[in-house]
């Protein structure tokens, strides 16, 4: 019998650590020894469909894509496993920040402004279309046909950042603990 093979997006990703923690809830040895592979998020559903992998841990919209086209079923979200941990971080070196203070400030302010605008946006039609235009969302999901999934993804976008976009020290501690535990 072929061993189970699961995929995540990167060995140092939140998805890798959430997958390991979820498996460890069942059996630590299984979590330690199961075959994990790395795949870019847009290829997860295709790899599952072609039986290259047996399951995956990835963020939206790819997990919903698999479910909508009938290839997979979401059994847990990373937020179910590790709530409120920083998922995405844009980091620059201290040297770069010192050499480019205006660019660094402008970049930070642009991200914060975009996060706030997304949080309070009433209509996500334009955002949704932009995500489709850039092939981030590669499947049809409408607010009239796939009501629950559409609003689930919209809610993830809206709450991508809480009150502060700053990573918290607890997030770094958790990530370092995971690196020591699983790498």
What positions do the PLM features span?
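A structural motif
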Residues: 83-85, 150-151
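Ligand-binding "clamshell"
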Residues: 65-79
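A bilobed periplasmic-binding-protein/Venus flytrap-type ligand-binding module shared by bacterial periplasmic
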Residues: 85-103
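Inter-helical turn/loop segments and adjacent helix faces that build the functional surface
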Residues: 29-34, 98-104
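Bilobed "Venus flytrap"/periplasmic-binding protein-like clamshell domains
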Residues: 2-68, 173
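Short coil/turn segments
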Residues: 9-14, 79-81, 94-97
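Secondary-structure end/capping motifs
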Residues: 101-183
């Amino acid at each position: 019998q072929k061993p189970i093979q699961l995929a995540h997006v990167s060995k140092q990703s939140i998805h890798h650590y959430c997958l390991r923690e979820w498996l460890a809830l069942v059996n630590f040895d299984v979590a330690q020894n199961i075959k994990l592979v790395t795949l870019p998020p847009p290829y997860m559903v295709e790899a599952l469909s072609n039986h290259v992998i047996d399951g995956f841990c990835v963020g939206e919209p790819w997990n919903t894509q698999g479910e909508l086209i009938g290839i997979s079923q979401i059994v847990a979200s990373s937020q179910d496993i590790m709530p409120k941990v920083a998922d995405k971080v844009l980091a620059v070196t201290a040297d770069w920040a010192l050499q480019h203070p205006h660019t660094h400030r402008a970049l930070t302010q642009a991200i914060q402004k975009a996060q706030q605008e997304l949080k309070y946006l009433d209509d996500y039609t334009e955002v949704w279309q932009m995500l489709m235009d850039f092939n981030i969302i590669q499947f049809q999901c409408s607010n009239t046909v796939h009501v629950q999934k559409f609003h689930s993804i919209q809610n993830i976008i809206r709450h991508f950042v809480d009150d502060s976009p700053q990573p918290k020290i607890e997030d770094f501690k958790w990530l370092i603990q995971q690196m020591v535990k699983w790498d």
